[in-house]
């Protein structure tokens, strides 16, 4: 069994690395280099990125800031599912959306894969460290209240 403090530290570092890579990808590649918001074929992709960016705050709060359980934890899992579906849709539309721009560069692909890996490590650790009772719908733990 992993030491919970070490697990939370690794999860936090992974989340921070994900956020830094995501911010770099969004600001540099999407807004500065490719200006996706100005490219009509990439409008939907840009909207997906914006939507996923908005999902980040409640997901981060529910899983990494608050000690959530019960309904709040399940709501967080629902948000993760919605984010995952949006990510899959993004992957499916990205190639065509960027075809006129030359597609996605290898370095941007590396950033996407690496950031996703950090996010998955963070989420997996946080969920693995939760006691089974936290997943009971009748559980109530949330440190922010």
Predicted regions and their residues:
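Hydrophobic transmembrane alpha-helical segments in integral membrane proteins
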Residues: 1-21
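Membrane-interface segments at the starts/ends of alpha-helical transmembrane spans
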Residues: 1-6, 107, 140-145
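Membrane-interface helix-loop junction between the first two transmembrane segments
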Residues: 23-44
């Amino acid at each position: 069994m992993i030491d919970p403090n070490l697990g939370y530290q690794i999860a936090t570092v992974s989340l921070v690395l994900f956020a830094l890579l995501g911010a770099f990808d969004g600001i540099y590649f999407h807004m500065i280099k490719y200006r996706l918001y100005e490219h009509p074929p990439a409008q939907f992709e840009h909207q997906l990125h914006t939507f996923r960016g908005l999902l980040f705050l409640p997901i981060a709060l529910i899983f990494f800031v608050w000690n959530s359980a019960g309904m709040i934890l399940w709501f967080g899992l629902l948000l993760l599912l919605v984010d995952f579906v949006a990510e899959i849709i993004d992957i499916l539309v990205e190639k065509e959306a960027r075809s006129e721009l030359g597609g996605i560069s290898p370095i941007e692909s590396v950033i996407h894969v690496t950031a996703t890996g950090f996010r998955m490590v963070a989420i997996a650790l946080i969920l693995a460290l939760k006691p089974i009772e936290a997943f009971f719908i009748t559980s109530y733990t949330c440190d922010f209240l």
